[in-house]
From Swiss-Prot:
It is a lipid-anchor. One of its GO terms (cellular component) is plasma membrane. This is Uncharacterized lipoprotein SERP2447. A lipid is attached at residue 20 (N-palmitoyl cysteine). Its main location: membrane. It comes from Staphylococcus epidermidis (strain ATCC 35984 / DSM 28319 / BCRC 17069 / CCUG 31568 / BM 3577 / RP62A).
Amino acid sequence: MHYLKKVTIYISLLILVSGCGDSKETEIKQNFNKMLNVYPTKNLEDFYDKEGYRDEEFDKDDKGTWIIRSEMTKQPKGKIMTSKGMVLHMNRNTRSTTGYYVIRKISEDNKSEIDDEEKKYPIKMVNNKIIPTQKINDNKLKNEIENFKFFVQYGSFKNSDDYKEGDIEYNPNAPNYSAQYHLSNDDYNIKQLRKRYDIKTKKTPRLLMRGAGDPKGSSVGYKNLEFTFVKNNEENIYFTDSINFNPSKGKSL
């Protein structure tokens, strides 16, 4: 399953920042604050002009491609797990964007066998508007796709300085790092997610932020946010948002 593979990747050799000194913790917090400044970016086409973290895999003439993803996952007690979200590949060389809307259903039978069903609907973006590239007969689904909003378009972290007592971790070998905070139900982003995705649980949510690259770097590399409301063997409600900067694929560099 895709999400299990992601979890495996995330579980790497992590070094607690407490053993690295206050300076490293400060660098990580400053880097996350830098990343959070892109929220909100209402016009996604602004990413065509944003620089990202570049490693040795980038060709010198490649401006890179932004990969933006937002996905909501819900699993009520006794029900199957359903994820709905969208992925965009924003090529800075061609200033063009393609992607897909994805619906994933995950169920588990009495023998503990897992069935993963996934449907993708290709899309493109023109003038900041999402357009399906194949005919969709289901009008409700078509409206979901055309009116989809990424978290980066409405999320805001202007009060991120209020996040206190976070768990900070750093792996210098990857390099990657993370920070986890417990949020209140009065948090702006939590209110936005509850309204947009009809989240009824009143359990206190937490925010996990992950990043890759040098924390001292001036550009955004890989960044992942996860807002978890409930996550256990019986019930799951969580939202993930990621911004990733990759080398462009194909010949249109």
